[in-house]
Amino acid sequence: MQKNILVRSIAALSGIVMLASVAACGDNTATTTDNSSSSDSTSKSTPISGNFSGAGASSQQAAVEAWIAGFQGTNPEAKIAYNPSGSGAGVQTFLTGATAWAGSDKALADDEVEQSKSVCTEGTAFDVPVYISPIAVVFNLKGVSDAGKHINMDAATIAKIFDGKITKWNDPAIADQNKDLKLPDTAITVVHRSDKSGTTQYFVSYFEDVTPDNWTYDLSENWPNEVGQGAKGTSGVISTVKQADGTIGYADFSQVGDLGTVAVKVGDKYNEISAEAGSKVIGDSKQDDTVKGDNRIVIKINHATEAEGAYPIVLVSYDIVCPAYKDTKQAEFAKAWLTYVTSDEGQKAAQDAAGTAPLPSSLKSEITKSIEAIKTK
């Protein structure tokens, strides 16, 4: 996701800022910040000071910028840099010990948990959910999107469109769900990500869980078929959809702008996308109890939710940290950072900056327990 952000170099961290890697979602603009607004959620007894860096998911970029500003309100001597190099690159950098934390759109793999023993002085690295963002099915259709109207679709219809099985906007499968709309006989042009993308994986996992008969591809961060045209990054998808009538794509909700969005069928209703609706599906989901390692909070999204008002297509992004660090200052920072980021104040800052969904209250006690596991002495 992209924002107009102020980038200021910090010499002590230039090695991290200049990491050359490919973003999982969006562009690779490194973010550093050294002054801020106030925060009441960060540790007040001992302000954090020093230079700290993270790298990873570009989906988090705008939120991280807001979090840095908020964190530094009560920790003005903390100099923080974040390189949105992509989830995979960020995790690998963290596993070399070069960063205090990684941002990732997917949970650690078993081999990455094992590898973390080389950088964590005790135990293994763990993931904490910090960022929830609804994924919009966006479209550009004359007379509909430009009139501010939604189009209703169930999972099977969306899957068939993105698999090239439905090719006209007035196809009966769409028209029967939108009897109040006059849909044109316009060809559908699918726009998908051309780059490796966590957003893609979360998007197609919805099909895999809800309508598997209509989506038979292996789950991957790469787009699996030759339907439509590819575009790099969230901005590329949005730009391409805007350019032509009849287009449809998928993108982080914060980037939708004035494009039309699909209201997705949940139970017997069609729910429009919103931050709050995205949070509801996470509140109706469970933790994945199959992951290895202590203190990990990995969400198994309940795409088949029937929760009132829930929007089922969402991305969950994590911060990955150690339970113990060689440098005590790193541990103190990681603990204070996660405490702020997952607080009500931190989540509100992310929502204001990036349109994210807040962490549901049902997760708060587990998140606090995991953060408390970080040893600072």
Please give the residue ranges for each predicted region.
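C-terminal motif of bacterial Sec signal peptides marking the signal peptidase cleavage site
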Residues: 20-24
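N-terminal segment of the mature folded domain
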Residues: 28-29, 34-35, 40-175, 238-240, ...
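Sec-exported extracytoplasmic/periplasmic mature domains
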Residues: 65-77, 95-99, 139-143, 159-171, ...
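Ligand-binding pocket segment of bilobal, Venus flytrap-like solute-binding proteins
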Residues: 91, 196-290
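Extracytoplasmic ligand-binding site segments that recognize negatively charged/polar headgroups
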Residues: 134-138, 144-235
